[in-house]
Amino acid sequence: MNLSRDEFVHGSPLQARVDLREIRDEDLIVMVQNGQRKAFDELVARYKGRLFSFILRMVKDPTLAEELTQETLIRVYLHADKYREIARFSTWVFTIATNLVRNKMRQRSRRPLLLSLNPAPEDDEMPLDPPDLRQDPTEGIHREELAAIMAAATAKIPEKYRVPFLLREVEQLSYEEIQQVTGLKLGTVRSRINRARNRFRQAIKPMLRNETLLAELERIEARAAEEDNEDKD
Amino acid sequence: MRCTKAMEYISLDLDGQLPPDHAAGLTRHLDECADCRTYREDLQTAGRLLAASEPQLSENFEWRLQLRLNQTLAEAAARELHPWQDRRTDRAAWWRNFAAAASVGMAAVLAVAVMTGPRAPSTAAVGDGPMAAHVATPVVPAGDRLELEAVRGFGYGAGQRSVSSGMGGQRPSQRPGLLGPGWSYQSIEDLRNISRIQAENRQLRTQVFQLQRQLQGMQSQLDTTAVPSLDLPEGQ
């Protein structure tokens, strides 16, 4: 639903009746600019999972990922007045998140937490072990386990390829939006996504042939579709 | 079409970005190349796995977010209400920087003054050079001159005498100029060292005296509390 700017600024009676779930992100942030905390809560509900999913696949640490997700959303609230509708709201949010993640990773690379005398084996090219589904094939793999395996596989992609890859594959941003978020040239975005896909495929290759896993994947997708339908109803 | 090019096109095609003029070429290649067909299927499955594996946030995420946001807003409001708090810290930092800069400046001025100021007459320079016209030539006995050279910068006994000898018996304050001709900061420093060392000597003497008294007390105590010899008489 599109609302005119006057309706936000002057608080028309219509506003009270509007279901926030029907309002576009870009209109919600205008409401936040006018001090409506409820609009911010709605944006949090829409973006917290997407941001966490994106950030976790970047930093691998769930605690740190939650912290950075919170930091991103707080910055959205504090700097809401800086948003201009020259770009989609999602582009703006993921730009903030990407910058925060990059800063954090830069800090971590300057201060390594652990130094080992024995260098870790070069495992970039090693595919991940597929989950052992023989123990309880009827139950299959849990969604959390799958999330952990995918996060580990994603972490094997070099960071410069991973950011555009996740923005495209998980967040479904267009190439132009990824270009805006990352500041890369369009051709570079294309080639990095292609290379990241290749690396990701190498990392999960054994899983791609696992019939039990593929069956569970179909069940997960069916459940997600049902939940979407319930939300719409 | 090579497979590497086809893989690039497959990626673009999955995102709906493949130009139509390349689509036909890719289709032809996929009809002929089983590896590239598998590659395309793998990418599709990988994308589905990634989408299905959305990680879950902890249950109290929103509550913690609200808490953190409220704290941030409260801190921001406090800064607006009491901006002097920030200014006070700024002012303290400014004073610290100023004090440091002033110390460096003072040290530099003193160093220049020491380097360029009048110096104590040395035995070789007395009566010679540009100072000779302004400085009354001190009468230094030959023996004292030698001592002056020998002790400058070392001890205080002979040095003290050499300073007084170098001044020809006059007090420094009676001399014209900032320090008076014939005086240098080195001479003043020597005098300070002398008085400091004398004070230290007095303290040391006092300590030695006290320790001697303590030692005497302990010896007398030892004499009075001395146990008899433990040597038992023979036969016991």
Please report, for each region that a protein language model flagged, where it lies by residue.
Chain A
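Helix-turn-helix DNA-binding module
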Residues: 151-188
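Structural recognition of an alpha-helix C-terminal capping motif at a helix-to-coil junction
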Residues: 53, 67-74, 87-99
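Arg/Lys-rich amphipathic alpha helix in sigma70-family domain 2
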Residues: 78-85, 95-116, 195, 204-206
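Short, charged helix-capping/linker segments at alpha-helix termini
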Residues: 17-18, 33-42, 52-71, 186
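C-terminal edge and immediately downstream basic/flexible tail or linker adjoining helix-turn-helix-like DNA-binding
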Residues: 2-11, 112-119, 149-152, 166, ...
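Short amphipathic alpha-helical boundary/capping segments
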Residues: 27-31, 149-158, 203
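Short helix-capping/turn signature of helix-turn-helix
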Residues: 46-49, 57-60, 166-173
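Acidic, proline/glycine-rich intrinsically disordered inter-domain spacer in sigma factors
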Residues: 13-19, 23, 123-152, 224-228
